């Protein structure tokens, strides 16, 4: 499991880990955005919170994640990205894993200062059609403003705008930061410097997983 404040690069690293170890990448953010795009009731509820920079309530996330990790492709492991975000979610996850005789092996904290987060997220762009994500500095599109995958327009999402990012960071420090102590007490917390180049961050994570 990877966690940190929004924009710390968790998603990028989680996808690389999933590819290297051939395990599912489970991202609540992706699940919520898919539901928002499809106009589901869950998506409508989630969008209300996400647009305000607030965390989606536990009851809208826990059941969805618990169902996902019990699917067949998760039997050999999985990487969680963006969940749990609160102590109650972490406790619910531990309880669910215990029921299927599994435990969380690592909780990896991708450490990035707040000021870096605001700059990073301001450069994010997302495709209006397929949901692909880019960054104007770190991962730009081949044609400015156009998605490489489908050619549709790319935009700055509402939840990546500076004022929303500041709110999200405040929520993170209040609700998610305590997870550091929670997983430290379990002896599974590891930390990596998220300000390094992405390939170096990934190498540090692989080294941890190989311990």
Model-derived regions, located:
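Glycine-rich phosphate-binding loop of ATP-dependent small-molecule kinases
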Residues: 1-211
